[in-house]
């Protein structure tokens, strides 16, 4: 009642960007630095760092520069998902799609129901890409501007998988050295 245009304040600042969230982690080990944009851990680290912003709708993109080639992982999950760690330190669950860049030829874990070998992997200096459509819950992964599996996030086709569950989506990573 009695609300005028002058009574509305534009969200400020605009163009907000997610960083890694040092306050919301699973397990132990790993170090975040450089304004929460860089994460480093030793071999077989099981620390999982989610992003500070979750996506309820729309199309979202994140990229990470891989600076070592040991056992890193990136992924997308339902924000309410409780992560479970399997024997090799991978992250998988009913609402997560994970790319294990450290396995011999790369491996995807999709909602705990399937695993795909020969998924590709980056190397030192590779730009690892993750795209999501929060409305359809589709996920795409890429390396150095090449989408895996002929994926096309712009067209909404050939996704790696569709995240189960229904909550907001978050990006996450497990170190073996990344910088976003």
PLM regions: where:
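PRY/SPRY (B30.2) beta-sandwich protein-interaction domains
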Residues: 1-180
């Amino acid at each position: 009642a009695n609300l005028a245009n002058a009574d509305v304040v534009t969200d400020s600042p605009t163009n907000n960007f997610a960083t890694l969230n040092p306050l919301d982690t699973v397990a132990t080990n790993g170090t975040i630095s450089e304004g929460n944009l860089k994460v480093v851990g030793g071999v077989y680290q099981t620390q999982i760092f989610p992003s500070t912003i979750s996506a309820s709708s729309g199309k979202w993109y994140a990229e990470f520069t891989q600076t070592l080639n040991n056992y890193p992982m990136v992924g997308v999950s339902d924000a309410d998902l409780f992560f479970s760690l399997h024997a090799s330190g991978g992250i998988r669950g009913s609402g997560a799609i994970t790319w294990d860049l450290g396995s011999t030829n790369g491996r995807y874990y999709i909602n705990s129901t399937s695993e795909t070998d020969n998924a590709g992997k980056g190397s030192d200096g590779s730009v690892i890409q993750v795209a999501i459509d929060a409305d359809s819950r589709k996920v795409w992964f890429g390396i150095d501007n090449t989408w895996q599996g002929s994926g096309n996030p712009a067209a909404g086709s050939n996704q790696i998988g569709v995240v189960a569950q229904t909550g907001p989506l978050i990006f996450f990573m497990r170190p073996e050295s990344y910088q976003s």
